[in-house]
Amino acid sequence: MMPEDEVTFRLAQLLLLLDAVAGQDAKGASLERIGYYDFLSANPFLVVDSDGREGNMLRLAGFDPQVLSYASSSQRFTSRRERIQHDLGLLVAYGCCEVHNRNGAFAYSINDRGRELGARFTATYAASFTTAASIVVRRLRKLSDKALREQTARWLRPDGEGGPGAALLSVLGPEPQAPDMPWEG
């Protein structure tokens, strides 16, 4: 069983994400945008160059750019996104976040109770995820919804630059080349 299969884990992760969103936009974010932020914060090397300053920060926080789970990113993105609405509904019901009408769409934001609860998380992963979420939200918040969808689709393509296929190739190496020997019959 994966941690993201546990409701408690997902709710805690969403609280940390909503807190990172509040640091960039106090009005919150849409369901769709939260879905992108959530997935990409858990897989930050799809967004961040592993050789840059932010890549170093992520490595220090415990993320590894060569983790093989990046190879199945698109499948995990789809299943995680389907759970987000349910999980946000639970956070609203528990009084940890609020939903508002923002330009005709729902926007979710953390409230004081959710912030207080999130501040009590002591797991190393909570600190790591908070670092990743802050970086990802800061990088992506200025993209329009359409640009965010398009960019994420490029990151999730197996053959995309810096995508899961590139991460897998960096671990496995290039495909074997045929020797320069003529076949004898």
Model-derived regions: residue spans:
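Winged helix-turn-helix DNA-binding recognition segment
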Residues: 78-79
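Accessory beta->alpha helical hairpin/"wing" motif in late/C-terminal subdomains of nucleic-acid enzymes
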Residues: 98-134
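Exposed, interaction-prone assembly regions rather than primary DNA-binding/catalytic cores
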Residues: 123-185
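Short acidic, glycine/Ser/Thr-rich loop/turn "cap" segments at secondary-structure junctions
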Residues: 69-75, 95-105
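Basic amphipathic alpha-helical segments that dock to polyanions
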Residues: 14, 83-95
